[in-house]
From Swiss-Prot:
It comes from Bacillus subtilis (strain 168). This is Spermidine/spermine N(1)-acetyltransferase. It catalyses: an alkane-alpha,omega-diamine + acetyl-CoA = an N-acetylalkane-alpha,omega-diamine + CoA + H(+). It holds the Pfam family Acetyltransf_1. GO terms for molecular function: diamine N-acetyltransferase activity.
Amino acid sequence: MSVKMKKCSREDLQTLQQLSIETFNDTFKEQNSPENMKAYLESAFNTEQLEKELSNMSSQFFFIYFDHEIAGYVKVNIDDAQSEEMGAESLEIERIYIKNSFQKHGLGKHLLNKAIEIALERNKKNIWLGVWEKNENAIAFYKKMGFVQTGAHSFYMGDEEQTDLIMAKTLI
């Protein structure tokens, strides 16, 4: 069992797009209407949007490979790329997406540790993320990894307003 990571570049756009759609759809389709899923996937993961994100110097994506097969990725943001105003001392983990077939292999922990490594390299004092209040597995994982809920914000899945919990962890 080998685990490797690779920083994504613009050349990885198609792979990133396919992986994003697959993992998001597999995770959330049972709890959301097909119309809202379609609207969100088309908005969040269209080619233009992902090109913009990949080109942003304040965002980074890293693929994770398990036994040489792509299994998921993490996206982190600093400064003005953060989806909420959390200040210069914070790093946001915007996405940790792992294919269903690769879950329960410790890959989420690897991706989270990569985010922490980046935060520490950049002298960030905190890391934070938003997680859907109904995503109980993810919430339990983040709590186990030392995150605490610090607030909440609205997240729109198509035309449906949902609540994301803001969870944070102090690093320094």
